[in-house]
Amino acid sequence: MSLHITEPVQRFIQSHKVARLATADADGQPHVIPFCYAFDGTAVYFIVDEKPKRQTGKPLKRIRNILANPQVAVVIDDYADDWTQLAYVLITGQAAIIEKEEEYERALGLLRERYPQYRVMSLNFPHNAVVRIVPTKVLAWGKVEQ
């Protein structure tokens, strides 16, 4: 059974292009990065793409962390100098690397629809990992519900 996410919260999630992903390693050491994502109403997806990475040759820290500890958090936010306009959505959930090619292709399609840059990248299964985050809790704060 999937978590019910209200229409205003779904619109807020869909209206943003970048979120922050928080992972933790097996020892609980946190790691936060900005990331591009797609949301289908029940899950958040992201891909390890061809953008330059700080490190090459081994799985990225976010992937290593998810494999060691699948509990993650995602924050999507609006900042404004007028603090009455502040808003965020905090999603906590379980992350997993997609292992079925059919789901991978569906998620990749969502990402390519949202980000034209992905349409020209050579992204393929299983070389470019796609991660699915299934929300277990969603918290909205501020001007989200408008």
Describe each region flagged by the PLM.
Residues L3-H4, G57, W83-Q146:
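Charged, gly/pro-rich active-site loop segments
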Residues I13-D25, Q71-I76:
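A short, Trp-centered hydrophobic/proline-enriched beta-strand micro-motif
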Residues A24-D27, L90:
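Short, acidic, Ser/Thr-enriched surface-loop or helix-capping motifs
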Residues V9, K58-N65, Y104-A107:
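Amphipathic alpha-helical interface surfaces
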Residues D40-Y79:
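A short mixed-secondary-structure module that forms the rim of ligand-binding clefts
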